[in-house]
């Protein structure tokens, strides 16, 4: 019985904390989403450039001996 009470108490506290959650406004959510999309795009471009550069360097090094 004591164990069941602890579980009940836990879920009551979860419910109380859920009421304290402050959700972002539509404007904040849109701005945050845009920041994430731009950041992913920029980091993807950086990875693309680095990958292309490393690929070319390796190709040059492999072709030196030929």
Swiss-Prot record:
It is a single-pass membrane protein. It is found in: Cell inner membrane. One of its GO terms (biological process) is protein targeting. Signal peptide: none annotated. PROSITE patterns: SECE_SEC61G (PS01067). Keywords: Cell inner membrane, Cell membrane, Membrane, Protein transport, Translocation, Transmembrane, Transmembrane helix, Transport. GO terms for cellular component: plasma membrane. The chain crosses the membrane at residues 34-54. GO terms for molecular function: protein transmembrane transporter activity. The keyword Cell membrane applies. The keyword Chloroplast does not apply. HAMAP family: SecE. Belongs to the SecE/SEC61-gamma family. Essential subunit of the Sec protein translocation channel SecYEG. Clamps together the 2 halves of SecY. May contact the channel plug during translocation. Component of the Sec protein translocase complex. Heterotrimer consisting of SecY, SecE and SecG subunits. The heterotrimers can form oligomers, although 1 heterotrimer is thought to be able to translocate proteins. Interacts with the ribosome. Interacts with SecDF, and other proteins may be involved. Interacts with SecA. This is Protein translocase subunit SecE.
């Amino acid at each position: 019985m004591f164990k069941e009470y602890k579980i009940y108490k836990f879920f009551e506290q979860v419910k109380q904390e859920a009421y304290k959650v402050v959700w972002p406004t539509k404007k904040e959510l849109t701005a945050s989403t845009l920041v994430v999309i731009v950041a992913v795009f920029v980091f993807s471009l950086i990875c693309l450039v680095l990958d292309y550069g490393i690929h070319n360097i390796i190709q040059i090094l492999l072709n030196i001996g030929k």
